[in-house]
Amino acid sequence: MPRLSTFSIAAFDPDDGAWGVAVASKFPAVGAVVPWAKSGAGAVATQAMGNTSFGARGLEMMAAGRSAQETLDALLADDVGREHRQVGAVDAAGQAATFTGKECLAWAGGRTGEHFAIQGNILTGPEVVDAMAQAFRLDSGDLADRLMAALLAGDRAGGDRRGRQSAALFVVKPQAGYGGFNDIWLDYRVDDDPDPVPRLVELLAIHRLYFGKSPADDQIPIAGEVATQLQRIMASLGYYGGPVSGAYDETTRSALTAFIGNENFEDRTDFAAGQIDRPVFDYLLRKFGG
């Protein structure tokens, strides 16, 4: 069985009630193996010659009230391959634990801190996990931002000494899934790419673009130059056949409704009030020109 030469972070955000894992590896589709998380239970990262049963079993144990350390102790107690395993966990209370078996290939090791467990194997050196820990502590964003800051810091510090191939971000919090029907807030994977961590950063930005919402002071009126640029874009794409006047009239509104609908930004455009979220407008300009 190939080893998952990997660096990962499992973490908890008590303010948001979120648990998650970010991971990168010189191995394809690392997101299918390493990250596990369950709202109200915790998060697990299982790697090296990873025992994938540690994911579901570990979450079940922590959901039943075991701490992260108690969970790792129980998982490893009867595992004949324990010295080839590397695993980190953060429990329902945010307590963290990490384990690196003696047979994991160098450099291998981990760090724990308040609400996080970091671990890696076949790394360029301990500077990778140290950089990850510092980045997680210093970032002031939400859990997804902090996880990605840590992963990017580890990647920039050297990461997997064999190279780069895949990365993943998995985050859960209560009713954060699409439509509020489950707890999966973020589940993004870059399965085979020469530079997967920056690509994963881009995917998180895309998620925020489509599912975010701007504050009132970042919503701009569709009038004047904004309307003119949108009319030009829509005319070039065949949505709009009227004059490029800068007026938000009924013809423009009808065309914009169709255009924005096809681009999936209905929730970030107020057609009745004639307003659009600035990040969406900026994105449309970059994508289509103005």
Give the positions of each predicted feature.
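N-terminal nucleophile
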Residues: 2-224
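Short acidic, glycine/serine/threonine-rich helix-capping segments at coil-helix boundaries
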Residues: 218-289
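Basic/polar N-terminal segments that are highly enriched at the extreme N-terminus
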Residues: 1-2, 290
